[in-house]
Amino acid sequence: MAASVWSGYLTFGLISMPVRLFSGARGSRISFNQLHREDHARVKQQLVCSADGKVLERDEIVKGYEYRKGEYVIIDPEELKKIEPKTAKSMEILEFVKAEEVDPVYFETSYYLQPDEGGEKPYALLVQALKESDYMGIAKVTMHNREYTVFLRPHTSGIMLHTMYYEDEVRKMEAPKITSEVKPAEVKIAHQLIEALAGKFEPEKFHDVYEANVKKLIEAHLEGQDVEAVAKPAKPAKVVDLMDALKQSLAAMKDQKKGSRLAEVDKESTVQMTPKKPAVKERRGRKRVA
């Protein structure tokens, strides 16, 4: 099992249970190293004192808060531990809200909340109660040197915890001003188009084609080959007649196997390796003698 990122107690009312938090997802991205263009050696980043130019070791560095230009208050890590709120070790559910009332825009990072030894029964009780009531819990927890407000919601794996963006962190966006009226007939065909594209959510069928192309590019370099360029999409034509465009879209969907569009889009963007073309030598003309 993966290492937990937090452990402590979850409480609601007089009920308390030991729990652990585990990361709910992790990004998988290809990373590149920075190299010296001339000899392809790795580039090192050093910590340098701005006053005397000395290269510093990690144990020579302290944390400081700049309260005035060029002047700092030095804070020791032990001092930060001393002022940790009780939520550093205890997560109390402060209230419950209906899941439908929470806009997903407030969800930040996801974690699995699992019971620790001795907390299995109250944990199972909470999971079942949340499922049957369609409520989510709101609690507070301190980790990574910050106190988070979090959502607790039932999940097939037990309870999912989502850290919450605070109100002042969520950007507001006004709804676009719609000047033209949507006709009932247009809405009807739009519903049919949605149904034609509707399917069961299967996250395993979605992939990052760009990352796959980068891997293919690296492989091509190692094997002395090249990759063909992905054809750029044509600029979509401006929709003049919305009803006509809807009807054409629906007709195209009827001729298409359900769920096949994703495979088509991925295939159109996936690169293939090709033999590297020999470099073209420049032809040099004879010099004319005056």
From Swiss-Prot:
Chain residue ranges for the region called Disordered: 253-290
Record's keyword annotation contains DNA-binding: yes
Function comment: With LigD forms a non-homologous end joining (NHEJ) DNA repair enzyme, which repairs dsDNA breaks with reduced fidelity. Binds linear dsDNA with 5'- and 3'- overhangs but not closed circular dsDNA nor ssDNA. Recruits and stimulates the ligase activity of LigD.
InterPro entries: Ku70/Ku80_beta-barrel_dom, Prok_Ku, SPOC-like_C_dom_sf
Superkingdom classification of source: Bacteria
Keywords, sorted A to Z: DNA damage, DNA recombination, DNA repair, DNA-binding
Full protein name: Non-homologous end joining protein Ku
Family under the similarity heading: Belongs to the prokaryotic Ku family.
Pfam families: Ku
Gene name linked to the record: ku
Residues of the Ku domain: 11-183
GO term, biological process aspect, one: double-strand break repair via nonhomologous end joining
